[in-house]
Each structure stands twice: as structure tokens, then as C-alpha cells.
Amino acid sequence: MKKKYLIGTGIVLVLLAAILLGAGQYMLNYSLRPDNRGRDLAGSWQYMFDTYPYLKSWKDSLQNAGALKDTFIYAPDDVKMHAYYVAAAQPTAKTAVIVHGYTDNAIRMMMIGYMYNKELGFNILLPDLRDTGLSGGDAIQMGWLDRKDVIQWMNTANEIYGDSTRMVCLLYTSDAA
């Protein structure tokens, strides 16, 4: 009788552990691999143009002048990272690194880029964090690796705009870095 009880208890514990592990894995994947609108570049541009109509003419003028540029870096773990950058209309040391939030991409921060670049006269750099936009990676991060990536992007901004930059770093949400 005692042997049957132990076997039954063991089976119940193994099943319970399997259920808990399965549920934990499901929740982890759900939170770290949500519907990633950050990969939909065309949809992101369309959303921005619909929401902020002035961005269309600004983007078109930047592209016609060759001022909206792309750059790529590699993170220490060999993930290829992307950013857009635009120099200010007049030479300046003022630079803004503008970082998007969870499941977004650099495109969805262009309204802030517009303000800093066109209205405040800053150089701007807008990175795509891991697994968003044109950046590599197999999962969106929640800040742990992003913090180092943002520092690397700030160093890249110094390389692009000069070592004497006066920099502001805008993080859209707390999980950005």
C-alpha cells in the first residue's frame, strides 16, 4: 500500500513539475517574443505618416538630400545592430541618441527625431534595438543587453559627429536601457 502511494505521489509530482515548466516556458516566450511590430518597417512608416503627417515631407526631403543615413555596428556577441542618423542643418556638437521602447523600432521615434533635429538643431541617431527594425537578434530584450548597446551607440554617435559632442540620450521607456 505504501509503495503504491509513493508511486502515485511521484507521478503526480512529475506531472505537476512538467505542467509548471511548460507554463513557465509558454509565459517566457509570450513575454520575450510578443507580436513584433518592430520588424514591420513599411507598417511603421505608414503609421508614423498617418499619425504625424509632417514627417512624410521631412523624410522625403532628408532622403532627397541624402541626409537620412543608415549605419551598422556589431555588439560584442556579434549581433548586427542598425541605426538611422541625420546631421543637423548647421554644424553643432549637440547630439541626441533617441532609443525606442519595447516592440517598437527606430522609425516609431522619428517624431522625436524631427523635434530634436529640425526644431532644436541637434544631430540625431535613432538605433533599432535587438530583434527590431533592421537589427539582428533572436529576441527583444528588456534592458539587460540594451544598456550596453545604448552605450555603444553613444560611442558611435561620437565617431560620426565628433568627439566633442554634447549628448542627450532619450530612452522612450524604462525597458529600453
Question: Model-predicted segments: where are they?
Answer:
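An N-terminal hydrophobic leader/cap segment in hydrolases
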Residues: 17-72
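A short loop-to-beta-strand scaffold at the N-terminal edge of the catalytic core in hydrolase folds
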Residues: 77-87
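Short beta-strand element of the alpha/beta-hydrolase
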Residues: 93-100
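The serine-hydrolase catalytic nucleophile loop
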Residues: 102-115
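Conserved alpha/beta-hydrolase
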Residues: 117-134
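Alpha/beta-hydrolase active-site loop
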Residues: 140-161
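Alpha/beta-hydrolase fold nucleophile elbow
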Residues: 163-171
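Conserved small/polar residues in nucleotide/adenosyl-binding loops
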Residues: 172-177
